[in-house]
Design a protein with these regions (language model features):
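Sec-exported extracytoplasmic/periplasmic mature domains
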Residues: 85, 120, 126, 173-177, ...
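Short peripheral tails and domain-boundary helices/loops at the edges of structured domains
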Residues: 155, 251-259, 404-416
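Short, surface-exposed secondary-structure junctions/capping segments
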Residues: 36-37, 41, 286-299, 355, ...
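Soluble periplasmic/extracytoplasmic beta-strand elements of cell-envelope proteins
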Residues: 60, 77-79, 122, 169-171, ...
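Extracytoplasmic/secreted envelope proteins and their assembly/folding machinery
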Residues: 77, 122-124, 138, 169, ...
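Acidic, low-complexity Ser/Thr/Gly/Pro-rich repeat segments typical of extracellular/periplasmic
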Residues: 2-250, 276, 414
Length: 416
């Protein structure tokens, strides 16, 4: 019970006791000074007894009871003064328990998991004061709704090891109009000391990169302090977290569509040269710097998904088990194994629909093929530089390919 509630209880007790004394007087007593003195003495004793029975422990629950736009991060908590917490329960409206952690000194409690959006929670707390008297407090609140909040889905994943070309890319689930406020709530730093700058691609995507590739064997830290930040009118952030990822060795591969060769370098030294087959004259491969964003040991490729269809509307090709596929653009450019083409094609003629093909065998299990070696020597974030294709340079937002912007143009896309 809070102090305010205790005071209300004492006032109620006073009124009740006063009423009893008044009825006794009306029923036939003397109205003298000694009677008034007796009433005052009885009231004082009643107040003293009530105070002794009330716990001094003062429990505070946040968010306050009735809140309907509560944060899902670090907002829910129970604290106590003049006592220690003995029991705290937190449940959703349907009774599902929420795990929590009581501090070692038993003065505070917090949920141990992030809360869900648009969910009503009930909190019940109990505490004892130094005399062993028990206090109780209850509260109910509802977290912010998805309609009134935004989150940023980021890559790479926490704890992952990626190549030197991997940007921090954040995709927001709501259009951001207050870009400066949101960008100020995000920091990206590297153990290498490299300057890192953000660049907006439209209203939903914000990428971060240094001027040159990340320093190999460094650690990058992403801090999101977006809880309560207004990204658009009536739409606030809910994320509050820090993640780190690691940069591996420096692998950059150079594909020359004219010579039809790919030179693979690690830490500046050429480790392998592989014959390739790039896009045909009718379906040229993009030029430019491209970052590996996904890897698939085997995947299906259907021409209809990228606009290559026959007159009947079906894909010009539909290969259900393309081996050793590595994505370079979101529009569908891959570097992958090819088991259906003659081995004489690689290194001599460009025949693909825009991808870069390497000699391979069906099943993706032949360790002796160039595609097997390249796939297993590569990690997400490695760089592939493609040249002499006769086509335009890939757009910087087609995949994770912001390296195709100059440093000046990259910085011009920052909101801060």
């Amino acid at each position: 019970m809070t102090n305010s509630k205790r005071r209300k209880g004492l006032v109620a007790a006073s009124a009740l006791l006063g009423g009893v004394l008044m009825l006794s007087a009306c029923s036939g007593g003397d109205d003298d000074a000694s009677g008034t003195k007796g009433k005052d003495t009885s009231q004082a004793k009643a107040d003293e007894a009530a105070a002794k029975k009330s716990s001094a422990a003062d429990i505070r629950i946040t968010p306050k009871d009735g809140s309907d736009n509560a944060s899902i991060n670090n907002s829910a908590a129970v604290t106590v003064s003049k006592g220690t917490l003995t029991n705290v329960t937190m449940t959703t409206a349907d009774g599902t328990a929420v795990a929590g952690q009581l501090s070692a000194d038993k003065l505070s409690w917090k949920p141990s998991t992030q809360l869900e959006r648009s969910t009503t929670y009930k909190v019940s707390a109990e505490a004892k004061d130094a005399s062993g008297l028990v206090a109780h407090e209850n509260a109910s609140f509802t977290t912010v709704s998805p309609a009134n909040s935004f989150i940023g889905n980021f890559t790479p994943e926490a704890g992952s090891t990626v190549g030197v070309g991997m940007p921090v890319s954040i995709n927001f689930d709501k259009a951001i109009t207050n870009k400066a406020a949101v960008q100020k709530g995000i920091t990206v730093s590297s153990s290498s000391g490299q300057q890192v700058v953000g660049h907006w691609f439209g209203a939903n995507r914000l990428d971060f990169r240094p001027e040159d590739y990340w320093k190999e064997n460094s650690t990058v830290t992403l801090k999101l302090a977006l809880d309560g930040v207004e990204g658009a009118p009536g739409v606030t952030g809910v994320q509050q977290k820090t993640v780190t990822f690691h940069i591996g060795r420096n692998q950059v591969s150079y594909v020359d569509a004219k010579t039809k060769q790919m030179k693979v370098t690690q830490d500046g030294k050429t480790v392998k040269t592989i014959p390739i087959s790039a896009g045909s004259p009718e379906h040229k491969t993009y030029n430019g710097v491209m970052v590996m964003s996904e890897k698939f040991k085997q995947t299906r490729m259907n021409g209809a998904t990228v606009g290559f269809t026959d007159d009947d509307g079906k894909g010009e090709y539909d290969i259900k088990d393309v081996p050793h596929a590595i994505r370079l653009t979101s529009s569908g450019t891959f570097i992958h194994g090819n088991y259906w083409g003659a081995k004489s094609v690689f290194g001599s003629v460009n025949t693909s629909h825009g991808c870069v093909g390497l000699s391979d065998t069906k099943g993706a299990n032949d360790k002796g093929t160039p595609a097997y070696w390249f796939y297993n020597s590569s990690i997400v974030g490695d760089v592939v530089v493609i040249s002499h294709t006769g086509d335009k340079t890939v757009q910087p937002d087609n995949g994770l390919n912001g390296w195709n912007l100059s440093w000046a143009d990259w910085k011009a896309g920052s909101a801060v």
